[in-house]
Every structure is written in C-alpha cells, then in structure tokens.
Amino acid sequence: MGKLDIIEKKGTERLKRGFAKMVKGGVIMDVTNAEQARIAEEAGAVAVMALHRVPADIRKAGGVARMAPIEKIQEIMDAVTIPVMAKVRIGHVAEARILEALGVDMIDESEVLTPSDPYFHIDKREFKIPFVCGNRNLGEAVRRIWEGAAMMRTKGEAGTGNIIEAVRHVRLLKDNIALLQRMTDEQIYGVAEKFAEPYLRLAFEVREISGLPKQVLENEPVYGHYTYREIVEGLYKILLEIKKLGRLPVVNFAAGGVATPADAALMMQMGMDGVFVGSGIFKSSNPPKMARAIVEAVNHWDEPDVLVEISKEIGEPMRGQDIEELEVRLEERGV
C-alpha cells in the first residue's frame, strides 16, 4: 500500500478524529533525530513530533522557524513504529501539502513555528490527513474545529518549562464550556457571531485601505468560499455540540510548558486527554528516565503514592523561564 493510499483512508472527518482517539491517554514527544525518536518509543510515547529544533532551541535561535527538513522527518519516520507527526507554519498550505504527500500521520499547524499567514489558518477540510491545532480559549478551539482540526491542544508557552500558561488555557476553556451550558440557544448564537469575527479581519482591512465602511455583503466570501453567515452557522453547530457534551467534540491534549511528571499529572487531573512534551524531555539531564517518568505519570495521574516513586531519581528537569520575562509570546500567534 502506497503513502497516497494510506492518506486516502484517513480522509473523512470520522477517520481523522478516530486517529486522534488512538493516541488518547498517552504522551506525544518532540524529537529532532532518530536516536531521540527511539528513546521516546522505548519510553512508551504514543507518537512523536518531528522537528528541526525543540521549542526551547527555536526560541533561543530566533529568526524564522519553518517546517523541519524532509530528510530529518524521513529519518524519524524510518526509526520508529509509532505514529510520526510534524509541524507546519500557521496558514502555510504548501508545507502541509508536502507533509501530506510525505506520509506523516498527522500535521500540527503550530504557533511554535513562525506564522506564514497573518489572517487565516489552513482550511484543514481540504486535506485527507488529520490536523492538530493549539488553542488558548474556546473561541480559538471552535474556529480550529470548524476548519477541520481533528485534535486540539493547549498552546501553553512552548519552550519555557513553565506550566502556568497551559493551566490558564485549560481553565479558560473549561469555564467557558461551563458558561455555555447555562446559556440559551439564542445566546449561544450570539457567541458564534462573536467567535466568527476574526474571519472578517482581511475584508475589513481592505475596506479601510479603500476608504470604505467596515461592512461585508451577505453573500460575500470572507474565508475561502465561506460567507460570514455560513461561518457563524458552522460555529453555532459546534457550540451546541459542546454544550451537549460538556467538552470539546475532539481529543484535547495539554501542551506548552510540561517539564516534570508532576506537570503531566496536573494536566491529566485537570481533565486533559493526554500530554504533548516538547523541550521537557531532551532538555532534562536524563532524557530516557524523564521520558519514562512522564509516560508513567500520565498513566497513574490519580495515584499520588505511585507518583512519588515515579518522581525519584529522574535527574534534573529542564531549566524553566519566567513567563513575565519573555520577549516573544508564542501563544499569541494565530487567531
């Protein structure tokens, strides 16, 4: 079976979300080479994320962060039997098409890389491969799900080893869902209209440049071939589903700042479906032990006595950064 045949089998929304459910309850680790990928697999990771650099090094290097080199991704794909994911820049359709043709298992449209489109994220429904996207709140999550994301994650603040932003994003999302469940359908439609406003940014900017009022026609496309009203209706449908379920309709992982087994357990205690670990493994003093400990912490998140043993003799975690001292906030990228 060729790679394109495999992609074809991933195509429907049901299959895309089904693939995401396969990694539920697990840990996905960032890796930059075959050796790291094998360490992750041996530690029990359910998947790996192939990058050129881990987020801490991306932050340190500065400049423009792009999709990892194809040779690097292929090296990682050849090294492990677990699923391999890879990141593309926000809005970069060409990078996504390349990864789809390469045959990775999932694409992360990621704020960790330098965004390529200041207005829009990729319309993920145009692809057969599943996507995961980050969110800071319910609005961002609903927009990404409407665009076709099969899996969500918190943005956190990648590369810092500081869990505070991931906690913030989980709390904002959960409390907004709780509020949604107390709202009438009419009120929820108003929320959908509010959440759809970012799709108007380009149209409004063009009108401002042209000296025209910031208004769009009822039948005017504002995102691909979708009108503002069509977007509102789509978001409204997802919001009603969230109200009914009491959670997002897709798998939702924690990401951004997970650096210790305790961090991973905290995210699971807060109701997340699993954990992404970026720099926290390979910026620690003993990556194999830290990797295994974080996997075990996710498996035993509600067993404090077990967590005590898991947290022993695992070496030093990565050096963390105070969020208030950051010059660049990766979480603010995207809309």
Swiss-Prot record:
Pfam families reported in the protein's UniProt record: SOR_SNZ, ThiG
Stored InterPro entries: Aldolase_TIM, PdxS/SNZ, PdxS/SNZ_N, RibuloseP-bd_barrel, Thiazole_synthase_ThiG
Residues that, per the record, bind D-ribose 5-phosphate: D30, G159, G257, G278, S279
Source organism superkingdom: Archaea
Assigned EC number: 4.3.3.6
GO BP terms: amino acid metabolic process; pyridoxal phosphate biosynthetic process; pyridoxine biosynthetic process
GO molecular function terms listed in the Swiss-Prot or TrEMBL record: pyridoxal 5'-phosphate synthase (glutamine hydrolysing) activity
UniProt keyword annotations, A-Z: Lyase, Pyridoxal phosphate, Schiff base
Family: Belongs to the PdxS/SNZ family.
Biological function: Catalyzes the formation of pyridoxal 5'-phosphate from ribose 5-phosphate (RBP), glyceraldehyde 3-phosphate (G3P) and ammonia. The ammonia is provided by the PdxT subunit. Can also use ribulose 5-phosphate and dihydroxyacetone phosphate as substrates, resulting from enzyme-catalyzed isomerization of RBP and G3P, respectively.
Family matches, as HAMAP family: PdxS
Name of the protein this chain belongs to: Pyridoxal 5'-phosphate synthase subunit PdxS
Lineage, highest ranks first: Archaea, Methanobacteriati, Methanobacteriota, Thermococci, Thermococcales
